[in-house]
Amino acid sequence: MSTKTYDAGVKDYALTYWTPDYVPLDSDLLACFKVTPQAKVSREEAAAAVAAESSTGTWTTVWSDLLTDLDYYKGRAYRIEDVPGDKESFYAFIAYPLDLFEEGSIVNVLTSLVGNVFGFKAVRALRLEDIRFPLHYVKTCGGPPNGIQVERDRMDKYGRPFLGATVKPKLGLSAKNYGRAVYEMLRGGLDFTKDDENVNSQPFMRWQNRFEFVSEAVRKAQEETGERKGHYLNVTAPTCEEMFKRAEFAKECGAPIIMHDFLTGGFTANTSLANWCRDNGMLLHIHRAMHAVIDRNPKHGIHFRVLAKCLRLSGGDHLHTGTVVGKLEGDRQSTLGFVDQLRESFIPEDRSRGLFFDQDWGGMPGVMAVASGGIHVWHIPALVTIFGDDSVLQFGGGTQGHPWGNAAGAAANRVATEACVKARNEGVEIEKHAREVLSDAARHSPELAVAMETWKEIKFEFDVVDKLDAA
């Protein structure tokens, strides 16, 4: 218990919350913020203000500080670093005692770390760049309901990335026509098809009808190909009660996998659904709709690597990560960094990939990285190189935009992927020799040849907005 005398009034945050001599404990939750302070606010004061407002502090001294051990519970700003190439901002490293957070509650962690502090007047902009979750905390979270190895065993598919596609047009199809598209793509060679993130239960296609027609399509494709297939049935709903109603119906239909929009649906709903999937033997695909609102501004918000870590703790078997090469934002090194955070057991600090801390996941299962957004056959050599086997390569327009139809588009993607995996396994640098690898495969696949001709000029060569900070 504190023995300090109560001294009313307002004092600088740095007097209490700036502790440069502090050595973080293994059990501390560590955070790195990019801070852009207001003019005339010192770095130390701004860092301390963030530590205070995200832990025990308020704008004035309060007498009830004497009723607790403030030195034990407070967040501590313990280090400040320059941001390469940015004279306005700096990195503030803050350590939080684990007792500040409810066990297994990502909701509680985020409420503290990215709550009111992000509207604090002492800073002009604030971004949460990374979190180190101590193993003590990781062990209190359920994590992915199944994990990579369990999914491979259930789907009986090994040695290559999974292949998927989002049904297009994403809105407006009737349930019967929607099911037809699913069947054609699965029959053509894909492993999964997917509801778009904004397909819920609209007037043109109510969820029950979609689930029924899609389940029939999956069963038919499985019978004809002899392969296990699946469709991500989106159970995201206006209420948790309705979400579970849809999940139960998907289970009754025999679906192997369901889907949730984890940011718009919320972490409470997501963790609850992950627990249900674990108990009911269901795979869980996670879409990240709304992420760019939160993570794309390089000075304010939350970096996606943090959202990815939070999702792994909350629970999900797949997570969309961008593609690097497609239509969506994504720096290559940064993407490789957070993909490792999804899949590996231990990831060391690596500033070249935007990783500010070591992260130990213990025995928590991994999450499949999903590459989706503006990709086609010409991207496959790069995608296989970047994401490896434990991933889902998901082609929407890159399947259904094929001149010969959905089945041909699926066949082209399957042939191209298997050709790239084979060449890679034989030691070929497939990204460097992409044209030769694909052209050789196309000699035996007219579907691939047509796809290559159709999309040979299609590139998305825009500069990345959210780049890694580098000198």
UniProtKB/Swiss-Prot annotation:
Q: Which domain of life is it from?
A: Bacteria
Q: Where is the active site?
A: 168 (proton acceptor), 287 (proton acceptor)
| Enzyme Commission code | 4.1.1.39
Q: Write down the species.
A: Allochromatium vinosum (strain ATCC 17899 / DSM 180 / NBRC 103801 / NCIMB 10441 / D)
Q: How is the cofactor bound?
A: Binds 1 Mg(2+) ion per subunit.
**GO MF term set:** magnesium ion binding; monooxygenase activity; ribulose-bisphosphate carboxylase activity
Q: Kindly list the positions at which N6-carboxylysine occurs in this protein.
A: 194
Instruction: Indicate the family of this protein.
Output: Belongs to the RuBisCO large chain family. Type I subfamily.
Q: What PTMs does it carry?
A: The disulfide bond which can form in the large chain dimeric partners within the hexadecamer appears to be associated with oxidative stress and protein turnover.
What protein am I looking at?
Ribulose bisphosphate carboxylase large chain 2
Q: Which cofactor does it need?
A: Mg(2+)
- Annotated keywords: Calvin cycle, Carbon dioxide fixation, Disulfide bond, Lyase, Magnesium, Metal-binding, Monooxygenase, Oxidoreductase, Photosynthesis
Which residue positions does UniProt flag as site: Transition state stabilizer? 327
